């Protein structure tokens, strides 16, 4: 949810509010008059589409300064220096992104302040305006850090069944393991796709024994390893997964199934598990994982 920071400046003019449902600010146009900032205008991007706001203030006979362009998504607006008269108008502005700073626009008179929030970016504005810009406030959203690409660790078990792959996500929130008489019958996972929660498909075939659930204290808890065993069973040419156990940064789950056959561990040091893949038919024959660095 966006954080609204109150407007700086005077109390006159008509209230306006661009809202907080934008992805980013991409351009700012400002004009200066004899009494201060004459008007301001913003371009936003939302779902890949550019939106331009009306002028906040009036155009008059002023000549606008060169626009401050923000090259989204690599660049974002993080701070604005504001000079204002508490009983009057916005006097001067300077815009600061994570990559550059605009020249100062207007007059350095009155009270100096900043619109900024640590580790957040500006995604919208509000304020008041009449014949000039009276006040200016902003909406802030958390900075989104691009995820390091995930990498798959090879699946272990046998090549029976059909291949499946849930892909890689931000994290794993829940694990469901179904059991059969001879091994693991099915698995299903709930993932964080930020901001949505995604429930993966059921891999294998559930039985009357149903599913056992392992719930993580997400996001502070994450899976760092999967331990298990696989073995050949009567009537099957290949092996089936007979037991699974999930290790997190806080705990180890109970074993799901019966420990029998060849033991294995899926793990990469300094990484967390963010997705699963494998092979299955009526039973789970093979399981592998996708991992990302824990710093993500």
UniProtKB/Swiss-Prot annotation:
Residue ranges, annotated region (Disordered): 1-20
Molecular function terms, GO-annotated: carbohydrate binding; copper ion binding
Entry keyword Disulfide bond: no
Phenotypic consequence of gene deletion: Smaller PYK10 complexes.
In-chain residues carrying the UniProt-annotated modification N-acetylalanine: 2
Keywords: Acetylation, Lectin, Repeat
PROSITE patterns assigned to the protein according to its UniProt record, in alphabetical order: JACALIN_LECTIN
Residue span, Jacalin-type lectin domain: 2-142, 150-293
Pfam families: Jacalin
InterPro entries named in the record: Jacalin-like_lectin_dom, Jacalin-like_lectin_dom_plant, Jacalin-like_lectin_dom_sf
Cellular component per GO, a single term: cytosol
Subunit and partners: Component of the PYK10 complex, at least composed of PYK10/BGLU23, BGLU21, BGLU22, JAL22, JAL23, PBP1/JAL30, PBP2/JAL31, JAL32, JAL33, JAL34, JAL35, GLL22 and GLL23.
Family label: Belongs to the jacalin lectin family.
Protein's job: Polymerizer-type lectin that may facilitate the correct polymerization of BGLU23/PYK10 upon tissue damage. Activates BGLU21, BGLU22 and BGLU23.
Name of the protein in its database record: PYK10-binding protein 2
Gene responsible for this protein: PBP2
